[in-house]
Amino acid sequence: MSFFHVVFVAFVIAAIGAAGWFVTPKGKNQTLLRTSLLLTLTCCYLMWAITYLCQLHPLITPRRSDLRMEY
């Protein structure tokens, strides 16, 4: 569970995007389909990566309210 997990998933998403680029059917909407596919993959990956990294390295440490504060 580290930064390398995020990089590995990025490579997987890039491979799916590259496969989707070549699999899209030819036609007048080919550009629209490719753009939609790549934007969807990018947005979903960014949402997952930011959420994962925020949980991995939180800015504010969680505190328990039932503990006594010590000096």
Swiss-Prot record:
Transmembrane segments: 3-23, 36-56
UniProt keyword Aminoacyl-tRNA synthetase present: no
InterPro entries xrefs: ATPase_V0-cplx_e1/e2_su
UniProt record similarity statement: Belongs to the V-ATPase e1/e2 subunit family.
Subunit-structure text: V-ATPase is a heteromultimeric enzyme composed of a peripheral catalytic V1 complex (components A to H) attached to an integral membrane V0 proton pore complex (components: a, c, c', c'', d, e, f and VOA1).
Main location: membrane
Location(s) in or outside the cell: Vacuole membrane
Lumenal side: 1-2, 57-71
Cellular component annotations (GO), alphabetically ordered: vacuolar proton-transporting V-type ATPase, V0 domain
Cytoplasmic side: 24-35
The keyword Ion transport appears for this protein: yes
GO biological process: transmembrane transport; vacuolar acidification
Matching PANTHER family: V-TYPE PROTON ATPASE SUBUNIT, VACUOLAR ATP SYNTHASE SUBUNIT H
Protein name: V-type proton ATPase subunit e
Record function comment: Subunit of the V0 complex of vacuolar(H+)-ATPase (V-ATPase), a multisubunit enzyme composed of a peripheral complex (V1) that hydrolyzes ATP and a membrane integral complex (V0) that translocates protons. V-ATPase is responsible for acidifying and maintaining the pH of intracellular compartments.
Keywords linked to the UniProt accession: Hydrogen ion transport, Ion transport, Membrane, Transmembrane, Transmembrane helix, Transport, Vacuole
Superkingdom of origin organism: Eukaryota
